[in-house]
Amino acid sequence: MDQPEDTDALVRFENITYSYPYSDSRVLSDVNLKLEKGEFVLLAGPSGCGKSTLVRCFNRLVPEISGGKLSGRVIIRGKDLREEKVHKLALEVGMVFQNPETQLFSLKVEDDLAFGPENLGLPGKEILSRVEKSLKAIKLEKLKDHFIFTLSGGEKQRTAIGGNLAMEPEILVLDEPTSDLDPSGTREVLDLLRRLNAEKRITLILIEHKLDEVFELADRMLVMDEGKVILDGKPFDILCREEGKLKKLGIHPPQIIEISRLLGFNCRTSSPPYENILKRLAELLMPSTRELQPESRKEAKPKIPPALCPEESLSHVRIEKLSCRREDGSETLKNVNLDIKYGEFLALLGHNGAGKTTLAGHLMRFHKPSSGRILLNGKNISKYSTAQLSQQIGYLFQNPDSQIFMNSVFEEVRFGLKNLKIPEEEMKKRVNSALEMMELSVYRNRHPQALSRGQRQRLAVASILALEPDLLVLDEPTTGQDRGHIHKFLDKIRELNRLGKTVILISHDMELVAEYAERVIVMKQGEVLLDGPAAEVFLSPEELDAAGLIPPLPARLALDLRKQGFDVPGMLTVSELKSFLRAHNVEIRD
């Protein structure tokens, strides 16, 4: 996509082409781009399309750190970055990664913010001034003396952003900064980015797959595929005009745009406010479904049953009075009781630090409970060896790099089978099947670190599936993946579930949970707050709010329509809303 040279542009990419040292294929191919000061740019595209590689060219992490072959020029404020040192570029470009833990170095918040300015050798007064301004910008003044390990995920990410702000860069690049955060933490970070762009005119480049939360913040959207920028324009314009092309790339429009178009709104320049969508729905449904007066529904509230445990159904996992304490005496789990049946597909929800991962980790004996027990197939898990547990339970960690260590994709998937002494022919069959299921067959000979994070996530899952466990525990398995791959992946997991596999999904993505999980468990501060069918749990706004969660848009609309007196079911997805409207002869636009 050629653009005329603009000497006034803040950033120019000129014919950027790049290949990693361990691959002959181009990750970036003849990219031409210019950015103006104060722009808020949303960078989208399928996993592995080159987004992360592109933004690492801003501060020469590519190729100085990654190696490989880079041709073309990146120019910032007229300076050719080939002539600049990486450490000096920190003054021009701030970089925030997916996992804040990778760039937090100090014990306390204010110390971490001071780290960069101290390394510049600035006077003490200047360092203090920058730290104070950064604390104010990220709204963590009251936590400046707190230890970083005590912060929530959102607070840690804001601290990472604050550390960059203390360097006073003109450009801030963020590579999926909300991917590991709960909805509350995501709101914190996105609100901060909005303020930084509006008040300080910092140029923002944001890589993000979760378009629902970010598309209205950006004033420009770039879409990449196969190392090239293929779309460049206003977010609303691209999302509305290029829906077919985007869906082929695995990029799905935000729910508010989908629903607005269904109801006949023009979304070319903006989406209508939630209140207008609700009003239009009420007008369309008035003739057929308004069977109750608002007052009669005013106090209606879905009841959330305790853990589902029909006695005639054998438990796959039974958790009894499970508690866990840290060394400092604080409780991470408090008297948890759950009964999980064979073949269930359930989701564990809750804010960062609610105890979801800790609870799931107890299944693999990663933690030692202070009291209580867990039965797997009716047998106490303390009686299983680690090898036996690994054959019974497939566990996917939040960070795929925690369980990837071989030199090729094929060898990675083969590793567990080899340790189990599976016959060679059977081993090859399982490896090939798992790679095909995760759409990684073409990468079988590639080094895992040459894959994108989303692809590495799928590789970790393939390694698990090859072992053929009966229980799958997936801790944020969709991190770093585009919507298309997410749906393909979870469709495969649902197929396995229908074949009898039990699935426990830990996620912060309410839309995906609403679409795939049959049962939802919400945790807060180490306790089970809600447990029941997904439709009922998502119609409990007060409890969800207390847990820092936001129900999907269709569920919120259903709840508010009920409050107005409409007899509507609990709708969780856009397709369920479509079906409901069609059933009541409401004319909609597909």
Curated annotation (Swiss-Prot):
Cellular component terms (Gene Ontology): ATP-binding cassette (ABC) transporter complex
Chain ranges of the ABC transporter domain: 11-251, 317-550
SUPFAM superfamilies, A to Z: P-loop containing nucleoside triphosphate hydrolases (SSF52540)
Alphabetic keyword roster: ATP-binding, Cell membrane, Membrane, Nucleotide-binding, Repeat, Translocase, Transport
Residues engaged in binding ATP 1: G45, P46, S47, G48, C49, G50, K51, S52
SS bonds (residue pairs): none
EC class: translocase
PROSITE patterns: ABC_TRANSPORTER_2 (PS50893)
Annotated binding of ATP 2, by residue: G350, H351, N352, G353, A354, G355, K356, T357
Pfam families for the chain: ABC_tran
EC number from the UniProt entry: 7.-.-.-
InterPro entries: AAA+_ATPase (IPR003593), ABC_transporter-like_ATP-bd (IPR003439), ABC_transpr_CbiO/EcfA_su (IPR015856), ECF_ABC_transporter_ATP-bd (IPR050095), P-loop_NTPase (IPR027417)
Function as written in the Swiss-Prot or TrEMBL entry: Probably part of an ABC transporter complex. Responsible for energy coupling to the transport system.
Family membership noted in the UniProt record: Belongs to the ABC transporter superfamily.
Protein's name according to its UniProt entry: Putative ABC transporter ATP-binding protein MM_3016
Organism for this UniProt entry: Methanosarcina mazei (strain ATCC BAA-159 / DSM 3647 / Goe1 / Go1 / JCM 11833 / OCM 88) (Methanosarcina frisia)
